[in-house]
């Protein structure tokens, strides 16, 4: 899909860069290091060398601050970029020929509630939208997280045991199917409305605010999403979906 459209940068909101005081943006032109997954160090080790659109990141930082949200630019050259950013950007654009902007997830749901998280994520998304519009750049927005997030807590004797390749339980699956059906119907405002209950019932990674941020930054789409797939990862539910605002390039993908 991305090979068929013209864009200047990828803007990604990641739940795996968790900040507890404000929202942070990568703020140096380049980050280069080795990422080792803190959960599965035996499975994920990645040498990255990524470029950041600092101008756009600073514009988002400024607009976010104007909205009353505490913000900070990450300018530590030794900062380890999170694996959510790395895996999502690599799978979407393995050539890494576009600059990125990475946004941290401020953990309001931990301090307060899912409702507070939603309001903050909305304000952040709207601020980012204003910054993008003022910049005149074309960007791809990425929300990197699972849907339902209950997962197995013991490892099978055979690491790739296919009998364990399923959603944790049926209630998680039913919730995910409900959300995906609403994606297909273009009912994104309704998704936003039920997000607190969905997040609580499924322990979803939506609790970081990524999906709400993206919907707010897109003006809450009312058109259908392109659904590319749904699959389990150690019991969690994962959906690949795309909201294309261009009616000429939007496809019916079920």
Can you annotate each of these PLM segments?
Residues 8-14, 103, 137-147:
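Beta-strand elements within well-structured catalytic alpha/beta cores of enzymes
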Residues 15-18, 145-150, 156:
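Short, internal active-site loops enriched in acidic
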Residues 1-8, 20-123, 154-254:
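Flexible, D/E/H-enriched segments
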Residues 59, 124-128, 144:
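Short, hydrophobic/aromatic alpha-helical segments in well-folded domains
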Residues 126-135, 139:
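Non-transmembrane, aqueous-exposed alpha-helical and coiled segments at domain scale
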């Amino acid at each position: 899909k991305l090979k068929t459209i013209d864009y200047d940068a990828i803007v990604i909101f990641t739940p795996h860069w968790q900040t507890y005081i404000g929202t942070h943006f990568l703020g140096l032109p380049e980050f280069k290091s080795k990422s080792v997954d803190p959960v599965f160090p035996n499975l994920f080790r990645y040498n990255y060398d990524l470029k950041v659109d600092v101008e756009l990141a600073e514009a988002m930082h400024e607009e976010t601050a104007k909205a009353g949200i505490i913000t900070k630019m990450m300018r530590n050259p030794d900062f380890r970029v999170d694996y959510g950013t790395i895996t999502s950007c690599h799978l979407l654009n393995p050539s890494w020929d576009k600059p990125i902007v990475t946004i941290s997830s401020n953990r309001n749901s931990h301090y307060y509630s899912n409702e507070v998280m939603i309001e903050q994520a909305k304000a952040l998304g709207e601020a980012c939208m204003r910054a993008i519009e003022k910049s005149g750049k074309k960007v791809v927005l990425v929300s990197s997280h699972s849907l339902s997030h209950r997962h197995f807590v013991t490892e099978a004797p055979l690491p790739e045991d296919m009998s364990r390749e399923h959603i944790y339980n049926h209630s998680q699956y039913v919730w995910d199917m409900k959300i995906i059906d609403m994606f297909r119907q273009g009912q994104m405002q309704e998704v936003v409305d039920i997000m607190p209950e969905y997040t609580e019932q499924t322990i979803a990674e939506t609790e970081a605010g990524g999906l709400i941020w993206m919907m707010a930054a897109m003006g809450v789409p009312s058109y259908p999403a392109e659904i590319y797939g749904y699959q389990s990862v150690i019991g969690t539910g994962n959906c690949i979906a795309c909201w294309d605002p261009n009616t000429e390039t939007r496809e019916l993908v079920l």
